Amino acid sequence: MTYSIGIDFGTGSGRVFLVNTENGEIIGQYVQTYAHGTIEGELNGHKLPQSYALQNANDYMEVIETGIPEILAKTNIDAKDIVGIGIDFTSSTVIFVDDQMEPMHNNPKFYNNPHAYVKLWKHHGAQAEADLLFNTAIEEKNRWLGYYGFNVSSEWMIPKIMEVNDKAPEVMTETADIMEAGDWIVNRLTGENVRSNCGLGFKSFWESSTGFHYDLFDKVDDNLSDIVRTKVEAPIVSIGESVGTVSAEMAHKLGLSPETVVSPFIIDAHSSLLGIGAEKDKEMTMVMGTSTCHLMLNKEQHKVPGISGSVKGAIIPDLYAYEAGQTAVGDLFEYVANQSPYEYVKTAEDRGISIFELLNEKASQRYPGESGLIALDWHNGNRSVLSDSNLKGSLFGLSLQTKHEDIYRAYMEATAFGTKMIMQQYQGWQMEVERVFACGGIPKKNHLLMEIYANVLNKKITVIDSEYAPAIGAAILGAICGGAHPNFSSAIQAMKEPVLYQVEPDHAQVLIYKKLFNAYKELHDLLGYKKARIMRNVSALM
């Protein structure tokens, strides 16, 4: 019997899973919240711009160096039976390191410099740089832009590199390598300085056939091409291939066999497709957490406006993987729950339930359209299909009779409407959606939300019984690289997570939600396209 380790680095915590390669059984698991969390608002007592979201890379290593030995000690598994390790990571989470692969923030002279720290995926400090890239690409009629949704996100790697070069050249000068944090973890485990085709292809303007888009970089900044060539370029390893084995030093430190094979990192949401078994084209998967990623597989490559990229073989060999997303979903629900009136909080405490359970109970008693509310779910900007991090959320239709559960339900509906915008975008560009999957802690716990999604999308929703699909997907990659399975299909079918429940659309509610969606779409187009300057001007005052 053999085992694989899946290491999942999420936004707020890291998880280590030991999984049976024959049947996907979770033998052991370890979860650790990052000690420094997400660094927002201030850094070491110094105020940060509102758009900043940073992390400390030492927290990531703490997850590995504590988690793996603890699991091995608790399970008594022979390390020689662990054939592979897979890693998934949020993206684009970018790290800047010196020539010893030490994060720049560990250098004492950069301790208070925010640009020496890891730039988390939701760091939006590079919007000006993203705009410059986009405008230059439009002027140059750059052919690649269509494969990135005809836009450039401040969340991607190249704008973040430009931001550091512009605002902290002293950090850039001493930086030896720039990479996705997932690639850095692979380096720490193996000693190999490589790049995953998944991270580069989706977030870094790199194509397998042509490499980086240096023709564009040259037009944007005189130094950008040189920075990418000397600090980003490295050998590429594709998903399904092996980077190598765990280094002797790390094997000794973690208690692993030096023969354990390591997979290249995969983006966390993408790993979920493997974990839930969505391996075919025409299937849309919603990976729902603090944000939501909407992933599609297709045999062909299409230029779909508003998506975040399309890369061949980034999840499943020979299939193009497409990514779109919403930047605030779980975060948005938590925001609304935190605004709950005192009497609601007190009632929940007295009944021994969470505030979310109380709000869901109350919201479920309301009928679609009953409150007269429509919300725009842009509290953290809009990733798809508008690709504008400067946009802000809105709530329309408030009256003196509006209750807090009405607001809560309106925001749940808004995230469903945002998902429908994305689904229609896929469908409008020759990508049929036949099945819809949902995974993550939110759909597992919130049946009402999935009912709303089924009725808004007018699709059956299949919810997977797993809060940790990314970790299982990473373990599947470890099993493939370690030789436990001959191919992707074999590994996925053996190790995937089971179905928890399915929700069918209700015809009567589908009809009501069509009308509400039309209202949402009109507001979306007005404030996202035609009158977007209104929100941008207000945001500029913050």
Swiss-Prot record:
<dbReference type="InterPro" id="IPR018484">
    <property type="entry name" value="FGGY_N"/>
</dbReference>
<keyword id="KW-0418">Kinase</keyword>
<keyword id="KW-0054">Arabinose catabolism</keyword>
<keyword id="KW-0808">Transferase</keyword>
<dbReference type="Pfam" id="PF00370">
    <property type="entry name" value="FGGY_N"/>
</dbReference>
<protein>
    <recommendedName>
        <fullName>Ribulokinase 2</fullName>
        <ecNumber>2.7.1.16</ecNumber>
    </recommendedName>
</protein>
<dbReference type="GO" id="GO:0008741">
    <property type="term" value="F:ribulokinase activity"/>
</dbReference>
<comment type="similarity">
    <text>Belongs to the ribulokinase family.</text>
</comment>
<comment type="pathway">
    <text>Carbohydrate degradation; L-arabinose degradation via L-ribulose; D-xylulose 5-phosphate from L-arabinose (bacterial route): step 2/3.</text>
</comment>
<dbReference type="GO" id="GO:0005737">
    <property type="term" value="C:cytoplasm"/>
</dbReference>
<dbReference type="Pfam" id="PF02782">
    <property type="entry name" value="FGGY_C"/>
</dbReference>
<keyword id="KW-0067">ATP-binding</keyword>
<keyword id="KW-0547">Nucleotide-binding</keyword>
<dbReference type="InterPro" id="IPR018485">
    <property type="entry name" value="FGGY_C"/>
</dbReference>
<dbReference type="InterPro" id="IPR005929">
    <property type="entry name" value="Ribulokinase"/>
</dbReference>
<dbReference type="InterPro" id="IPR043129">
    <property type="entry name" value="ATPase_NBD"/>
</dbReference>
<dbReference type="GO" id="GO:0019569">
    <property type="term" value="P:L-arabinose catabolic process to xylulose 5-phosphate"/>
</dbReference>
<dbReference type="GO" id="GO:0005524">
    <property type="term" value="F:ATP binding"/>
</dbReference>
<dbReference type="GO" id="GO:0019150">
    <property type="term" value="F:D-ribulokinase activity"/>
</dbReference>
<keyword id="KW-0119">Carbohydrate metabolism</keyword>
<dbReference type="InterPro" id="IPR000577">
    <property type="entry name" value="Carb_kinase_FGGY"/>
</dbReference>
